[in-house]
Amino acid sequence: MKWGVYILRCGDGTLYTGITDNLPRRLEAHRAGRGAKYTRGRGPLALVYWEKQTDRAAASRREWAIKQLTRTEKEALAASWDGDTPATE
């Protein structure tokens, strides 16, 4: 699987942005409390955005760019997502 950037909506309404090369495994880690400290105790978690990248460096650059966006801009990005993920492609 190629690298990508994802956004999760936490149970408290906040958004978390991260990168992975295995989205199903990473989502399971977050949901089991083995993901980022930020998402622990903030469930339930919902995937609201996924974007494929060519490699880890590209994914990291895109993650940084997304983290610079305002919440409104992140919400617009999430709203534009068509729902395709590595598990359904």
Describe the function of each predicted region.
Residues 1-53, 57-89:
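GIY-YIG nuclease catalytic motif and its immediate N-terminal context
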